[in-house]
UniProtKB/Swiss-Prot annotation:
The keyword Cytoplasm does not apply. GO terms for cellular component: chloroplast thylakoid membrane; mitochondrion; proton-transporting ATP synthase complex. PROSITE patterns: ATPASE_ALPHA_BETA. It comes from Castanea sativa (Sweet chestnut). Its EC number is 7.1.2.2. This is ATP synthase subunit beta, chloroplastic. It is found in: Plastid, Chloroplast thylakoid membrane. Its main location: plastid. HAMAP family: ATP_synth_beta_bact.
Length: 498
């Protein structure tokens, strides 16, 4: 198999007809193309079909070479609908892999898998482009330092801290706040780290992609007046697109993120929603290419495909890519090959709970289900580790006592257990926090809470110094000083009412 060299030819857009082939067969989104002898395109080369269909409509379809079949034939997967294509049509070999625009020109814009803008805001500066297929950074380039990526979100920083240059899985159903959490992270990294974000919508609903774009404009993450001031680039390959586009859109987003890391030497946040759809698209393509299915009907190359994407998401000596990936779990079965393969690559898992969302505690991160490999005393320090463990123990004890409380009531508990329950309820409320991106809806200003402030707050609650304060004072505040101030206000209000 000949793999294409990873250099990109910037002149490909001019499309010189140096190497022409013809369509021999069309099977849905898969094309077989015949080329002259000794002029076979390399694997991953982009092929372009231009022409008119029987109705006279203009056709412009880009495909990617996947297999060399022998007899001067290649099999390619289309990145857009193949309606109107016919046998015998001319196919141009571009001589290079798909290349997409990278750099500052991509910020504030929406792209498709081919790097074409789809937001009706005019053309994008394409002087700097990059091929979507690259090898992962070499060992010698990797940065092996373990450091915490502070998000300013209390529950995340304390109980399941993110690793700089790590990969985080975001597990949650519909309507529990995945999108709002993603937007807050984009906002916080822009403010605190001066970094940029890339959002890859892989096989998601078009409506959700549109909602995200509108919300980003409202919250100022995308600056409509001065687009260059925006902090995020969006790449979408929606559910209605062919499997080829859904399989490659993650790589397009990753390529844009890699440029910010390697050339601009920035810390980048890469969001992928949803990583399961990437696997699903790969499975469809695999079947279309005639490969034998593997376990549960997935592609036999599942681990390789996942690895080639995930291994490129890493920290180098130049900068870091920290990736947050939404993971759909089919039929809630974590042993399904798709989520199981994803788990192997994750450094932390953030689990969103419908129960907490129903209580009105946002972000609805489940403090007991969420995990992180970074929560070790040698990495985060003894104080952080001890505080996190004591918070978890208190919440776990509260969870165990809930059945007894439901049947017998609080009065039947021992003095010690009643104290634990009171503190756990304060902790639960203190884990909530007002978000900057939700200011429009809640009316309360967002809060960024530093890690040292977070630890100080929870230590005070656990020590019992704040046992006299009402639990309502801890709900939707930033640091612990705001909670004590809120308690004083609540006390004054109740006195005035009396």
């Amino acid at each position: 198999m000949r793999i294409n060299p990873t250099t990109s030819d910037p002149g490909v857009s001019a499309l010189e007809k140096k190497n022409l082939g013809r369509i021999a067969q069309i099977i849905g989104p898969v094309l077989d193309v015949t080329f002259p002898p000794r002029k076979m395109p390399n694997i991953y080369n982009a092929l372009v079909v231009k022409g008119r269909d029987t109705a006279g409509q203009q056709i412009n379809v880009t495909c990617e070479v996947q297999q060399l079949l022998g007899n001067n034939r290649v099999r390619a997967v289309a990145m857009s609908a193949t309606d109107g294509l016919m046998r015998g049509m001319e196919v141009i070999d571009t001589g290079a892999p798909l290349s997409v625009p990278v750099g500052g020109a991509t910020l504030g814009r929406i792209f498709n898998v081919l790097g074409e803008p789809v937001d009706n805001l005019g053309p994008v500066d394409t002087r700097t482009t990059s091929p979507i297929h690259r090898s992962a950074p070499a060992f010698i380039q990797l940065d092996t330092k373990l450091s915490i990526f502070e998000t300013g979100i209390k529950v995340v920083d304390l109980l399941a801290p993110y690793r700089r240059g790590g990969k985080i899985g975001l597990f949650g159903g519909a309507g529990v706040g995945k999108t709002v959490l993603i937007m807050e992270l984009i906002n916080n990294i822009a403010k605190a780290h001066g970094g940029v974000s890339v959002f890859g919508g892989v096989g998601e609903r078009t409506r959700e992609g549109n909602d995200l774009y509108m919300e980003m404009k409202e919250s100022g993450v995308i600056n409509e007046q001065n687009i260059a001031e925006s902090k995020v680039a969006l790449v979408y390959g929606q559910m209605n697109e062919p499997p080829g586009a859904r399989m490659r859109v993650g790589l397009t987003a990753l390529t844009m993120a890699e440029y910010f890391r390697d050339v601009n030497e920035q810390d980048v946040l890469l969001f992928i929603d949803n990583i399961f759809r990437f696997v699903q698209a790969g499975s469809e393509v695999s079947a279309l290419l005639g490969r034998m299915p593997s376990a549960v009907g997935y592609q036999p190359t599942l681990s390789t495909e996942m690895g080639s994407l995930q291994e490129r998401i890493t920290s180098t000596k130049e900068g870091s890519i920290t990736s947050i990936q939404a993971v759909y779990v089919p039929a809630d079965d974590l042993t399904d090959p798709a989520p199981a393969t994803t788990f192997a690559h994750l450094d932390a898992t953030t689990v969103l709970s419908r129960g907490l969302a129903a209580k009105g505690i946002y972000p609805a991160v489940d403090p007991l289900d969420s995990t992180s490999t970074m929560l070790q005393p040698r990495i985060v320090g003894e104080e952080h580790y001890e505080t996190a463990q004591r918070v978890k123990q208190t919440l776990q004890r509260y969870k165990e006592l809930q059945d007894i409380i439901a049947i017998l009531g609080l009065d039947e508990l021992s003095e010690e257990d009643r104290l634990t329950v009171a503190r756990a309820r304060k902790i639960e409320r203190f884990l909530s926090q007002p978000f900057f991106v939700a200011e429009v809806f809640t009316g309360s200003p967002g809060k960024y809470v530093g890690l040292s402030e977070t630890i100080r707050g929870f230590k005070l609650i656990l020590s019992g110094e704040l046992d006299g304060l009402p639990e309502q004072a801890f709900y939707l505040v930033g640091n612990i000083d705001e909670a004590t101030a809120k308690a004083t206000n609540l006390e004054m209000e109740s006195k005035l009412k009396q």
